Amino acid sequence: MPGVTITTAVRTGPTSATVRESSQAFFIGLAQRGPVDEAVLVRSLAEFEETFGTYVTYAYLHPTVQTFFEEGGTQCYIARVVGPGATTANVILDDGGPSADELIELTANGPGNWAHSMQIQVTASGSLRNIKLTYNGDLVYQTGNRASASALVSAINNSAIASQYMTATLLIDELPGASAAVAFGAGTYTDGNDDIGDSTVDTTFTAYVSALDLFLDSYGTGAVVCPETHQINTQLIAHANSYNRIALLHLEEGTSDPADDAATLSAEDHSEHAAVYYPWVFIPTDVNGVNKLIPPTGFVAGKRALAHNQTGPHQPYAGLVSSARFVNGVEVDVNRTLGDSLDAEYVNAIRFIANSIRIYGARSLSTDTDNFRFITIQDTVNGVVIEANASMEDLV
């Protein structure tokens, strides 16, 4: 039709424009790059990739965040985890003279060998200097011609683009010499390494638990998730209780007894703050016909966000509202009999029902079924507590 252009594309952002604070998620995990000393708020997969990079084979964080947004999520905080021996790559710019006086230190935005793909070049135009940054061979930032080292440093540190890749520290306020492109971590510069292993996740238990501290109380309520491991489920529950949040939990891939695994978690203190979901789910990949198996918590967090934004924290994120838009398979086919038995053991099944994949349960892990049978009860209480605390701030 003349004058009409139709464009198709894969969704990479939230599917709802409404954002209730209670709908947000807090994700801990491994990433290609990014800071490790703060939690970063992102509102789309594109924003996530700008700071934390693209998919890496050893991590579940990227596909979990992707699933969250595809299934209705609107915003989440990300806490990146690295190993205990992680190092951050750098480059030092000198005056180009015989003494090689060090003038500016450029440090990658977070540990890891991803920084080896960054190169820095200094160009000269008379008495002015310009610092160019390339990543994977593409020019991503340049300072423009500046008259002093302090001006170069200021330009880098005040740039939203440059800060995704590096920070600058002024050592001596003298102009650096012109130089050919040099890679971060090359030669005598500090190498970058995230210390998480080549093909298996060997990041320490302590690193995951410590990352929970990055989710500050001031960020409000929401759901906390760690897709990389089920081994910190107890700590996720404790965090959720302390910060008026919900812990969305998964079990080990291929577990033969999900009910028994959930029973152990039900015995934990404050289990009314947690819900467990089974089985793992499949999502599509960039390769046509190839799917990837991931923990179900990104899917659940997305449907929780959708329910909160459409209705409120009292709305169960199960049944019709949880019909999958992106998830396309389940690890185990849960029939009605198995689903009912799992529900009796505080496990929320994800099932193929009415030609769609849906969450088939809204149980919390609490054995106090008179007061906390459903996870939405604690979700509602959390919202009331947060609003009450906010209202009383002016009276304190």
What does each of the following model-derived ranges do?
Residues 1-396:
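A glycine- and small-residue-enriched flexible loop/hinge signal that marks low-structured segments
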